[in-house]
C-alpha cells in the first residue's frame, strides 16, 4: 500500500525540486548580467572622466574670459574717470569765463554809475556857479574903491582876451558840430549794418530750415521705399514657404503610400522604433531648449531696443529744452539790444539838453557882455566879469585838454582794432586750413569704414558658406548612418528620403543665396545713400565757408569805414566781437555737423548689424523647419511601423493560442490574462505618448506662428521707431558730444552684460545637459533592472501558484479515487510533467531572447550616448569658435575706442588752443580798459578834489548860518513856551474843577458818618462787657476764655505775646478815645471789642446815638480827615470780625 504512493510522491517532489532548483541557464544569465553591469559602469566612468575634462577646460576658458572682462571693466572705468575729469575741467573753465563776463558787466555798470554821478556833479557845479555869481555881485560893492585904478589898465587887456576867447569858443563850437555829425553818421552806418546782418541771418536760417525739410522729405521717401520693398520680400517669402509646404506635403503623401506598401516586410523593427522615439524626444527637448534660448535672446534684444528708444527720447527732450533755452537767450539778447538802443536815445537826448544848456549859458554870457558894454563906467562890475571870464577860460582849457586826450585814446583804439583785424584774418586762415584737414580726415575715415564693412561682409559670407557646408556634411553623415543601420530592411525607402532631402536642401540653398544677394543689393544701396549724404554735407560745409568769407569781407569793409569816423570806434568793437562770436558759433556748427556724420555712420553700422542678425535668424528658422520636417517623417514612419508590428504580434499570439489551447487550458490561462494586461498597458502608454507628441507638435506650430506674427509686428514697430528716430535726429543736430559719450558708455555696459549673460547661459546649459544625461542614464538602467526583476518575480510567482493549484487538485482527486485510478494518474502525471518541462524550457528561451534584446537595446543606447557626446563636443567647438569671434569683435571695439580717444584728445588740444587765444585777447582788452579807467579816475579825482574844497568852504559858511538860525529859533521857542504856560484857563475847565471839588466834599462827609457810626457801635459793645463783669466778678479770671490760666498783672500790657485769631480794632487805634484807665480789668482774650484804655471800675454812660459829628480822633487825624479816604486794611479787619 505504501510503496506506490511513496514512489509517486518521490517522483512528484523530485520533479518539483528539479523545477525550482537553480538551473545552469539561469546562472549563466546572472553572470552575463553582472558582466553587463561592470562593462556599462566602466564605460560610464570613462565618459564621466571625459566630461570632467571638458568641464575643466570650459572653466579655465571661463576664468580667462572673466579676467579679460575685468581688464576691460578697469580700462572702461579709467576712461570714464578721465572723461569726467575733462568734463569737470571744461565746466570750471566755462564757470571762470562766466565770472569774467559778470565782472566785465559789473565794471560797465560801475562806469555807467560813475558817469551818472559825474553828470550830477556837473549840475551841482552849475548851481554852485550861479550862487557864486550872486556872491561876487555882493562882493563887488565892497571892492569898488580898491580896484578902480587896476580896472582902467586892465580894460584893454580884457578886450583882447575877450576876442581870443570868442575865437576859441567859435572853434570849439565848430569842433562840437563836426563831432556830432560824425557820431550821427557812424550810428546810422552801424544801424544799417546791423539791419543787414539780421536780414542775412534770417535768410540763412530760412535756407537752413528749407534744406532740413527737404532732407527729411527725402529720408521719409527712402524709408517708405524700403518699407515697401521689405513688405514685398515678406510676401514673396510667404508664397515660397506655402509652395514648399505644399510640395513637401505631396512628397510626404507619396512616401507614406510607398512605406505603407512595404510595412508588411518590416516586422522586427520595434526596438529600433523605440530608440528612434527616444532620439526624437531628445531632439524635441533640445529644440525646446534652443527655442527658449532664442526667445530669451529676442526678449533681451527687444529690451535693449526699448532702452535705446527711451535714451533717444530723453535725448530729444533735452535737445528741445536746449532749443527753448537758446530761443529765450535770443529773446533776451534782442531785449538787451533794444535797451541799448533806448540808452543811446537817452544819451542823445542828454546831449541835446546839454547843448540847450550850453546855448543858454552862451545867451547869459551875451547878456553879461551887454551889461559890461552898458556899465563901462561901473568898474566893480567889470572886475567881477574879468574874474568870471578867467574862470570860464580855465574850464574851457580843461575841456580842450580832455578832448585832446580823447583824440589820443581814439587813435590808440584804432591801432588796437587794426591789430585785431590782422589777428582775425590769421585766425580765419587757420580755421580754413583746419576745416580742410577735417574734411580730408572725414574722407579717409569714410573710405576706411567702407573697406572695413566690405571685409566684414566678405568674412560673414565665408563664415556662412562654411557653416552651410558643415551643416550639409553633418546632415549627410546623419543620413549615411541611418542608411547603414536600416540597409538590411529598407534600402529603397532611405534612398528616396535622401533624394528628397537633397532636393529640399538645394532649394533652401538657392533661397538662401537669393536672400543673400538681395541683402547685398540693399547694403549697396545704403552705401550709396551714405555717400550722397556725405557729399551733401560737404556742399553745406563749403557753403558755410563761403558765407564766413563773405562775413570776413563785410567786417573788413566795416573796419575801413570805422577808420574814417572816430566816434564809431566802440560800435565797431562791438560789431567785431559779435562777428567773432558768430564765426565761433559757425565753427561749433561745423564740428557738430562732423559729429552728426559720425553718428550717422555709427547708426548705419548698427542697422547693418541688425540686418545681419535678422538674416542669421531666418537661416536658423529654416534649419529648424527642416529638422521639424525630418522629425515628422521619422515619427510618422515609427507610428506606422509600431502599428504593423502590433498587428503581426497579435496574429502570432493568436496562432500560438490556437496551437496550445488544448494543452494549456488550465495552466496558461493566468499567463494569457497577465500578458493581455501588459499589452493593454503598453498600448495605452504608446497611444498616450503618440498623443502627447502630436499635441507638442501642434503647440510648437502655434508658438512658431505666434513668434512669426510677433516678429512681424516687432519689425513694423522697429521700422516706425526708426523713422521717428531719423526725424528726431534731423531736427536735433546741435549738442551730441555728451550723448555720444553716454551711448558709448551704455554700449559698453550692454556689451559686458551680454557677454556675462552668454557665459552664464553657457554654463547653465552645460550643467543642465550633464545632469540630464546622468539622470537619464541612471533612470534607464534602473528601469531595465526593475523590469527584469519584476518579470522574473512574476514568472516565479505564477509557476508557484500553478503548482500549488495542481497539487491541491491532485490530492483531492487522489483521496477520492486512490485505488481505482492510481496507475492512470501516474501515467498522466508523467505526461503533464513532461509538458510543463517543455513549456518551462520554452519560456526560459523566450526570457533569454528578451534579455538579449535588452542587452542589444542598452548597447544601442550606449552608442547613441557616444554620438550625443560627440555632438556636444562639436557644439562646444562651435561655441569656442563663436567666443573667438566675439573676442575679435571686442578687439575691434577697442581699436574703435582708441581711435575715438585720439580724436577726443585732438579736439581737446584744439579747444585749449582756442581758449588760450581768447584768454590772451581778453587780457589785452582788460589791460586797455584798466589803463583807460586809471586815466579817467585820475581826471575824476582831480575834479573831485577841486569840487570838494569848494564844497567844504560852502559847508562851513552854511554851518555858521544854520547855527545863527538855530539860536534865533531857540529864543523864539522859549518865548512861545512861556506864553503857552501863562495863558488863561477856559471856562469849561473851571466848571469841571468845581464839580470835582463838590464830589470830593460829599465823599468826605460820607466817610466821616461811617467812622462815627463805627465808634458808636464799639462803645455800645464796651458798655455791655463792663456790666457783665460787674455781675460776675467772683471768678478770678473774668473775661478770659481759659479760666484755669493765671491772671495777669494790671500793669502788664503786652497784647503782642498772645495769639490773636482776629486783630483787635481798638488796639490798632492806639490814639483813640479817653485818657486810658489803668485800673480796668483785662479784656477778654481774642476779643476785638475791648480796649485797654477804658476804665473797668466805673460804668460807662449809656450810649446815645450821635446827633452830630464827634471828634474822637487826635488833632492830626482831625486835620487829615476831610481829605483822607477810608483805609482798605481797616475795612478788611471789619469784615473778619463780623464774619467771626
Curated annotation (Swiss-Prot):
Transmembrane segments: none annotated. Its main location: cytoplasm. Belongs to the FAM184 family. It is found in: Cytoplasm, P-body; Cytoplasm, Cytoskeleton, Microtubule organizing center, Centrosome, Centriolar satellite. GO terms for cellular component: centriolar satellite; ciliary basal body; cytosol; extracellular space; intracellular membrane-bounded organelle; P-body. Residues 1063-1128 are annotated as: Disordered. InterPro entries: FAM184A/B_N. Residues 57-256, 296-800, 868-907 form a coiled coil. This is Protein FAM184A. It comes from the Eukaryota. Keywords: Coiled coil, Cytoplasm, Cytoskeleton. Signal peptide: none annotated.
